[in-house]
Amino acid sequence: SNLSTVWVIAVVILFQPELRRILIYLGQNPFVRYLFRVKNLAMVGEITESVLICQERKWGMLIVMEGEVGLKHIKEKSASINAQVSAELLVSIFNPTSPLHDGAVIISHEVIDAAKCILPLSEEPQGARMKLGTRHLAALGLSEETDAHIFVVSEETGTLSHVHNGVMKRGIDEIQLRKVLNNLIV
């Protein structure tokens, strides 16, 4: 067992340039890229479906798509999920009777990483922001500190908002949602 581990490490070290070229080739191969694209398109569909269901039912929803800035400090204080993204799971998490429905869901590296995440509130609730609910203020707060894309469904109106870099776009529709998700994921 120890000898085989040494051999694997030796092969990786000796053939590092060749292995790197193979990985680059695979990354540029249209078939391999197509396989990843199909998987990612499915994830876009799952997220979109869950948003539409929660909008229809007027269930509050807060989905964070983690960017380059890590959210480890938030995930540590939340419920770890580590599950494949599915509409059924997202809808069940945001069901008002679910113990996980309060807080945000963080999607990271194509998995639902955590739920019941408490996000920082925006520190400047002035003007129009004074009329926002806690979910929207939390989305703004996180977007002011990180590069995450956050999607919020209002439980009062069923309206979908997209928040990024401290800017909130309210009333986005299914087409706009798919476009943003495609740019993020695919």
Residue ranges and their predicted role:
Residues 10, 15-18, 22, 26-186:
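Divalent-cation
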